[in-house]
C-alpha cells in the first residue's frame, strides 16, 4: 500500500509537465487537459476593488503574493461579476448562472440577505460546481464567508447550508461581516432599526401621555387598560432600541464548523488565525487529492478586521492595512501548498465578488476600495467599477506564465471550467451562462465565447455589453443608471448603496452607448452624430436582450420581503435564546 501511494504521488507531481508536453505537441491540447483532475483552490476577496492590487496598476498598495500569482499565471483584465453585491454574485459564481435564474435577486430593494435568521437562500434545486465535483470524487471544502442562506423552516434544518450544496466541509460565517458586527458608525442595519424603534417609541409615549392626561382631566373617556398597554409598549420599544445592536452582533456575527456553532459572537482577534489554521488543516488532510477548496475571505469588508501587527502599516489607512493583511494570508496559503508538495498539481484562482465600495466613508476617511480607472463601484449594476474584478489563474507547467487576456470573461465561467477539469458534465437540464475558459487560458482560442454579457441590478437589467469580434470592438449599452449624489460625484454618497429602481435612477431613451475598447472609463457617450453604426449597435444589442429574456423562467425571489425578514424560530443560537453565547474551540496555534 505504501508503494502504491508513493506511485500515485509521483504521478500527480509529473502531471503538469506531461500536460505541458501535450500542449506543445497538439493544437487540441485543451481536450487532453479535460478531466485531468487537478486540485482546485479558489480564492475570493469580499468588496475588493480591481485597483487595489499591484498587478492591476496600484503602486502604493503592497500585494506581493497576489502579484506573484499573476506573474506565474494568467491575468484577466476584463473579468466581470454577474452582480455588484455579495449574495447574487456568489450565487452566480457557484452555479454558473445569472442570479435572476435562481431567484437570488429582489424587486423591492433588499439586494442581499439581511439576516441569518431569514428563510431565503440558494435554492436546493440549484446545482453548484461543488456538488458536481463531489460526485466525481473530490474532497470539497468552503472556508470563510457563505451569505447564501441557512434555514428554511426551523433553526436546525440548514436547508441552504454549504453542506447541502456540495461541500463536505464548512468552517466560517454563514452570514457576512458587517460594520454592525463591531458596532461601527458605518452601519448596515443597526442605525436604521434604532431610528425606527425610537420613532415608534416616541409615538407610543405620546399616545400614552395623551391618554393619561385625557383620563385625569376627564376629557377622554377611556379605561386604564389602553393607557397601561401603550405605556408598556413604549417602554418595550425603548428597551429594544438599546438592545438591537447586541441582538445583531449575536444573531449574525458568529462562526460555524459544519453544522455546529463554534463561536457566538465572533472574537475578532482570533478570526484570521483561525481561518488560516483551517485552510492549512484542510490542505494537509486532503493532500493526496483531488480536492476543491473555496477560500471565501472575510477581507476586505467592513469593519475591516485587522490583526495588530498590520495596523498602521499601509499608506491607505485601515482599508489598506486590511488589503495587505489579506495578501499576507494568500502568501501563507501558497506556502502551505509548497510545503505539502501541492503547488504544481493545484489550479489556483483569485478574484473578488464585485467592485470596491465608494460609499463606505466617514468624513474624509475612505473605508472602501479603489476601482482604478473604472466608473462606479459596489452596488451599481452597470458601471464597470461595480462589476469589473480581478481574475488570476495559476497552474505551473500548464498555464503560460505572465499571460494577459483582455477578452470578456465572467465569474460564472469558473463553473464549467472546473467541472470540465474534474471530468464532470455541465448540467443539460438548465441554462448555464458561464463558458469554459480552458481554451482561452491555454491559448488554443484567441476569443472568449461570450458575445454578450448582461448586467443586472436586482432583477432589473441595467446594461449589456457586445463583443463585436469582426471589428474588435467592445460595445457597452446602459439602459438604466443611478443618479449620483451629489451630482457628478461618481457615487451615491447620500445612501449606503445606489438604488436599482425608482426616482433615483434614470431610464435612458435612447440608451447610453460606450466603446469600452477605446473608452474603458465610460466617459465619452456616443451618439448617432458621433458614431456611424449607433443604430445598428442598438438594434443588435436589443435583439440579444430579447433572446436572453426568452430563456428566463419565473422563479420565487429569495431576497424579497418574505424571504428576507428576521424570524426568531430560524435564528441559530448556541445558548438559550436570546442569550446566544459560546466559545467551543481553543485559540489557534
From Swiss-Prot:
Q: Which GO terms describe its cellular component?
A: endoplasmic reticulum lumen; extracellular exosome; Golgi apparatus; Golgi stack
Record's keyword annotation contains GTP-binding? no
- The active site of this protein is located at 86, 147
Q: Which GO terms describe its molecular function?
A: arylsulfatase activity; metal ion binding
Q: Which domain of life is it from?
A: Eukaryota
Does this entry carry the keyword RNA-binding? no
Glycosylation, residue list: 58, 125, 258, 344
- Which catalytic reaction applies to this protein? an aryl sulfate + H2O = a phenol + sulfate + H(+)
Q: Where does substrate bind?
A: 145, 301, 378
PTM annotation? N-glycosylated. The conversion to 3-oxoalanine (also known as C-formylglycine, FGly), of a serine or cysteine residue in prokaryotes and of a cysteine residue in eukaryotes, is critical for catalytic activity.
The cofactor named in the record is: Ca(2+)
Q: Which Pfam families match?
A: Sulfatase, Sulfatase_C
Dependence of activity on temperature = Almost completely inactivated after 10 minutes at 50 degrees Celsius.
Give the 3-oxoalanine (Cys) positions (modified residues).
Answer: 86
How is the cofactor bound here? Binds 1 Ca(2+) ion per subunit.
Q: Which GO terms describe its biological process?
A: skeletal system development
Q: Which PROSITE patterns match?
A: SULFATASE_1, SULFATASE_2
Give expression by tissue: Expressed in the pancreas, liver and kidney.
Reported pH dependence = Optimum pH is 7.
Activity regulation behaviour: Inhibited by millimolar concentrations of warfarin.
Question: What is known about what this protein does?
Answer: Exhibits arylsulfatase activity towards the artificial substrate 4-methylumbelliferyl sulfate. May be essential for the correct composition of cartilage and bone matrix during development. Has no activity toward steroid sulfates.
Name the family: Belongs to the sulfatase family.
UniProt name for this protein: Arylsulfatase L
Question: Which organism was this protein described from?
Answer: Homo sapiens (Human)
- Lineage, broadest ranks: Eukaryota, Metazoa, Chordata, Craniata, Vertebrata
Gene expressing this chain: ARSL
Amino acid at each position: 500500500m505504501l508503494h502504491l501511494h508513493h506511485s500515485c504521488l509521483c504521478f500527480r507531481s509529473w502531471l503538469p509537465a506531461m500536460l505541458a508536453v501535450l500542449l506543445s505537441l497538439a493544437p487540441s491540447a485543451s481536450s487532453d487537459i479535460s478531466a485531468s483532475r487537478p486540485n482546485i483552490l479558489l480564492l475570493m476577496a469580499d468588496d475588493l476593488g480591481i485597483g487595489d492590487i499591484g498587478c492591476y496598476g496600484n503602486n502604493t498598495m503592497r500585494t506581493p503574493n497576489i502579484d506573484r500569482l499573476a506573474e506565474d499565471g494568467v491575468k484577466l483584465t476584463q473579468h466581470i461579476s454577474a452582480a455588484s453585491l455579495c449574495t447574487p454574485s456568489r450565487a452566480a459564481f457557484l452555479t454558473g448562472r445569472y442570479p435572476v435564474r435562481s431567484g437570488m435577486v429582489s424587486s423591492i430593494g433588499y439586494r442581499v440577505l439581511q439576516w441569518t435568521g431569514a428563510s431565503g437562500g440558494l435554492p436546493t434545486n440549484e446545482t453548484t460546481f461543488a456538488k458536481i465535483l463531489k460526485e466525481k470524487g473530490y474532497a470539497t471544502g468552503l472556508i470563510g464567508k457563505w451569505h447564501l442562506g441557512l434555514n428554511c423552516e426551523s433553526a436546525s434544518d440548514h436547508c441552504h447550508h454549504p453542506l447541502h450544496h456540495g461541500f463536505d466541509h464548512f468552517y466560517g460565517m454563514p452570514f457576512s461581516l458587517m460594520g454592525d458586527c463591531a458596532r461601527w458608525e458605518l452601519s448596515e442595519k443597526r442605525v436604521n432599526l434604532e431610528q425606527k424603534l425610537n420613532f415608534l417609541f416616541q409615538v407610543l409615549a405620546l399616545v400614552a401621555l395623551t391618554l393619561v392626561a385625557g383620563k385625569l382631566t376627564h376629557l377622554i373617556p377611556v379605561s386604564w387598560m389602553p393607557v397601561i398597554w401603550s405605556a408598556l409598549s413604549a417602554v418595550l420599544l425603548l428597551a429594544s432600541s438599546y438592545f438591537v445592536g447586541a441582538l445583531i452582533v449575536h444573531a449574525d456575527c458568529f462562526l460555524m464548523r459544519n453544522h455546529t456553532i463554534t463561536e457566538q459572537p465572533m472574537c475578532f482577534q482570533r478570526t484570521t488565525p483561525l481561518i488560516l489554521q483551517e485552510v492549512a488543516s484542510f490542505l494537509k488532510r486532503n493532500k493526496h487529492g483531488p480536492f476543491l477548496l473555496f477560500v471565501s475571505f472575510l477581507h476586505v469588508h467592513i469593519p475591516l478586521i485587522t490583526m495588530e501587527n498590520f495596523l498602521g502599516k499601509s499608506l491607505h489607512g485601515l482599508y489598506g492595512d486590511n488589503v495587505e493583511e489579506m495578501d499576507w494570508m494568500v502568501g501563507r496559503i501558497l506556502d502551505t501548498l509548497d510545503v505539502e508538495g501541492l503547488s504544481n498539481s493545484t489550479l489556483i484562482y483569485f478574484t473578488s465578488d464585485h467592485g470596491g465600495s465608494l460609499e463606505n466613508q466617514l468624513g474624509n476617511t475612505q473605508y472602501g476600495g479603489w476601482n482604478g480607472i473604472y466608473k462606479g463601484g459596489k452596488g451599481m449594476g452597470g458601471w464597470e467599477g461595480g462589476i469589473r474584478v480581478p481574475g488570476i489563474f495559476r497552474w505551473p507547467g500548464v498555464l503560460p506564465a505572465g499571460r494577459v487576456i483582455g477578452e470578456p470573461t465572467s465569474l460564472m465561467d469558473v463553473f464549467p471550467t472546473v467541472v470540465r477539469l474534474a471530468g464532470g458534465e455541465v448540467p443539460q437540464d438548465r441554462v448555464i451562462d458561464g463558458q469554459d475558459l480552458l481554451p482561452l487560458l491555454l491559448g488554443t482560442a484567441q476569443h472568449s465565447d461570450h458575445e454578450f454579457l448582461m448586467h443586472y441590478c436586482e432583477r432589473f437589467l441595467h446594461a449589456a455589453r457586445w463583443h463585436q469580434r469582426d471589428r474588435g470592438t467592445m460595445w457597452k449599452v446602459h439602459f438604466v443608471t443611478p443618479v449620483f449624489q451629489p451630482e457628478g460625484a461618481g457615487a451615491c454618497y447620500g445612501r449606503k448603496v445606489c438604488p436599482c429602481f425608482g426616482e433615483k435612477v434614470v431610464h435612458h431613451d435612447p440608451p447610453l452607448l460606450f466603446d469600452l475598447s477605446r473608452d474603458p472609463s465610460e466617459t465619452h457617450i456616443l451618439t448617432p452624430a458621433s458614431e456611424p453604426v449607433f443604430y445598428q449597435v442598438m438594434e443588435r444589442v436589443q435583439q440579444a436582450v430579447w433572446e436572453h429574456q426568452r430563456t428566463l423562467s419565473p422563479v420565487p425571489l429569495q431576497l424579497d420581503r418574505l424571504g428576507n425578514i428576521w424570524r426568531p424560530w430560524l435564528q441559530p443560537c448556541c445558548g438559550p435564546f436570546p442569550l446566544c453565547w459560546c466559545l467551543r474551540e481553543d485559540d489557534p496555534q
